[in-house]
Design a protein with these regions (language model features):
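Hydrophobic alpha-helical transmembrane segments
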Residues: 14-140, 144-169
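Aspartate-rich (DDxxD/NDxxD/DxxxD) Mg2+/diphosphate-binding motifs
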Residues: 1-15
Length: 169
């Protein structure tokens, strides 16, 4: 039943509410972080944070593509590998390599603690979503990958906010 509902392209009231809440949470977290960081470092953190949250959050769906089977129609799927199979280790490692420049920039600009907080937040978010998807759907679809990316974007922002507000933790 869940897969049938996900095929419907219309957006329901819960979908709208989830999008609005996610957007408002991002705005609040960004405003909080930038309010703390901008007086000290100027606009540079805003640019780095905007790029970091996009780059780092896009690695998590690759983990789902590697670990979960696709449960939708394979013929119309855009989430399967070009070869028509799950993402292999080579694809996952390639994705990890593409995230390394951002990790290096965060290391240089931030600290190892910031990277650790982001890694923990994204790992826990992805692991919990993966468990839920495996139990609920038996795998993943393209919608699940989009949700994973958005949740991990929020996780990156939350980790940065925790780091900026409580740098000792």
């Amino acid at each position: 039943r869940s897969l049938e509902i996900m095929k419907d392209s219309r957006l329901g009231s819960y979908g709208v509410m989830a999008l609005v809440m996610a957007l408002l949470t991002k705005v609040v977290l960004l405003a909080t972080v930038l309010d703390k960081m901008t007086p000290y470092w100027g606009p540079v953190p805003a640019v780095i944070l905007a790029v970091a949250m996009h780059v780092l959050s896009r690695f998590a769906p690759l983990v789902l593509m590697h670990n979960l089977a696709h449960v939708g129609l394979a013929a119309s799927s855009k989430t399967l590998n070009v070869a028509g199979q799950q993402l292999g280790w080579r694809g996952l490692i390639t994705g990890a390599i593409w995230t390394l420049p951002m990790v290096a920039l965060l290391w240089w600009f931030g600290s190892g603690w910031l990277i650790l907080k982001i890694a923990i937040a994204c790992s826990v978010t992805t692991w919990l979503l993966q468990r839920w998807l495996r139990k609920r759907l038996g795998g993943m679809t393209g919608d699940c990958l989009g949700a994973c990316q958005q949740l991990n974007e929020l996780a990156v922002l939350l980790a940065v906010a925790v780091h900026v507000l409580r740098p000792v933790l």
